[in-house]
Amino acid sequence: MVILFIKKEAIIFGFKNLSPILDSKDMADSTKVEEMNRYANDLVSELNSSFVLVEAPDAVMRFNDITPNGFGVLSYMVSQAFQPDYLICSIPFELAVPEMVKALSKYFEIRLGSPISAALASNIVVDSAENLQTHVMSSLFVPMNYSMLKLSQEPCADQIPIFSVINENDPRLFMHVTNLLAIHLDRR
């Protein structure tokens, strides 16, 4: 397995780092995509890996026109370098409703080449008042008992499971990812 992260600190854990390519001022964006693809293919060959796990380098979509948050440009570049088989996405619990997850999945499938395989809902929400006043993305935490209650009432969104990252004793996300990887490895 090859794990590629954007943060330089990831190398402490043995993960590979994409920062030198993404942060390069000497390469055009198209060259960065080619370099990331070459780098990953070299790692897969060298390590005889069956799959590559890649962290999205920025928000995968723009929040609004007031507060720029990366617009998903870097994530789009990464998705061009590595055709994703699966996308596990983190969302605020207030968006963890089947209709929204289904709409996001369709959007990501068009934009990034992969639908959402699973959604992780957290008790973080966007602080819209702060966002409008300062034009800076900020968030706040909703009490866990409130968000857990809301999440427990939401079903899956068209076969897209919605997991709570708040409940640390819930093994379902790990089991879901393990099943996805088993299916992926069986296809090879």
Regions found by a protein language model. Name each.
Residues 1-188:
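Flexible phosphate-sensing "switch/lid" loops adjacent to ATP/NTP-binding sites
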